[in-house]
């Protein structure tokens, strides 16, 4: 049975109204996984090869969370980052993303980026979804074209984010 954007948004909102914290986000993660695995959902919302890298599909007027489609062509490695005071859920729909979790070893200060050390790497394959709560630092790496669904706790266009870079190896 097809999972529509309207059903997806309604399920996410109900989960976050019940619990806006980590438990509610974990429930939302299951809906992200469901949408990523739904062929009709992917065909409708994640098949436009001319789409910009990030497209907001839905922004909740009350809770402010966003459902975004991400389109990445070819290989790309992103820098370590967090989502400011917000959170995000990444769901893999097409291709594979290798995620790296990072630990902050020196906070950003005086206009200098924070320094991070690698904690672990793990793949996100189609249907996999992962919650990144406030303060969780991570970076995606793609060897080829990918499509993702990302839930943002609020529209990240309006969130100040601190820059990070890898600490030098001793």
Segments (PLM) and residue ranges:
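A short hydrophobic beta-strand segment most commonly corresponding to one strand
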Residues: 89, 144-161
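A short glycine-rich, His/Asp/Glu-containing loop-to-beta-strand
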Residues: 48-74
């Amino acid at each position: 049975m097809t999972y529509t954007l309207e059903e997806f948004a309604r399920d996410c909102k109900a989960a976050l109204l019940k619990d806006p914290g980590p438990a509610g986000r974990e429930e939302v993660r299951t809906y992200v996984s469901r949408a990523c695995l739904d062929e009709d959902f992917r065909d409708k919302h994640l098949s436009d090869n001319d789409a910009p890298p990030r497209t907001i599909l839905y922004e909740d007027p009350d809770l402010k969370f966003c459902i975004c489609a991400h389109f990445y062509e070819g290989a790309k490695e992103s820098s370590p980052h967090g989502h400011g005071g917000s959170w995000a859920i990444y769901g893999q729909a097409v291709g594979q993303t290798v995620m790296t979790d990072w630990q902050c070893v020196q906070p950003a200060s005086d206009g200098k980026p924070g320094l991070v050390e690698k904690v672990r790497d793990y793949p996100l394959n189609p249907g996999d979804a992962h919650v990144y709560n406030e303060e969780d630092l991570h970076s995606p790496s793609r060897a080829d074209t990918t499509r993702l669904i990302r839930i943002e706790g609020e529209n990240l266009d309006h969130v100040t984010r601190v820059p990070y870079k890898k600490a030098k190896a001793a």
